[in-house]
Amino acid sequence: MPEMEKKDDARIVIISSIGAITPMPKSSIYAAAKSAIHSYGESLSRELRKKSITVTVSLPGYVKTKAHERAGLNHLKDKVPWWMWINAKQVVTETEKASIKGKAEIIPGKVYKLVRPFLNFNSAIRVWRKITRRN
């Protein structure tokens, strides 16, 4: 941190997940871990604000990577609608722009920005449960 404190535009980016801010039945450990990362980022952001270090937490939704495959979640490719997937480049681009602007949080992807206010509704949780259910 001492080296970062010497700079005028020091930035830290932390990647969490949209799962940090919504209940995720059957994925409670994942949601809890992402919530902890999100909370850590928010706390760090407030701690370092006085030192002119910007901390941005990114909360992406479903990102097209091989991570789902490696985690044994291949069924998500077929069950999650195409419009809910975003590519990694979009996550990086939107997160970088938010960091440069000094934002503490970014939710990459228009669809996730639109649905965020509804993520804690029971209907949204039921839809998520149906989409992610294994056959």
Predicted features and spans:
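Amphipathic alpha-helical dimer-interface segment in Rossmann-like NAD(P)H-dependent oxidoreductases
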Residues: M1-K6, S45-R46
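Active-site loop immediately N-terminal to the catalytic Tyr-X3-Lys motif
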Residues: M24-S28
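Hydrophobic structural elements of the Rossmann-like NAD(P)H-binding subdomain
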Residues: V13, V55-S58, H68
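Hydrophobic alpha-helix immediately C-terminal to the catalytic Tyr-X-X-X-Lys motif of short-chain
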Residues: A36-L48, S58
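Short, flexible catalytic-loop segment of classical short-chain dehydrogenase/reductase
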Residues: P60-R70, N74
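Active-site helix of classical SDR
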Residues: A33
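C-terminal helical subdomain
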Residues: V57, D78-L114
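Residue(s) in the substrate-gating loop at a strand-loop-helix junction
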Residues: S17
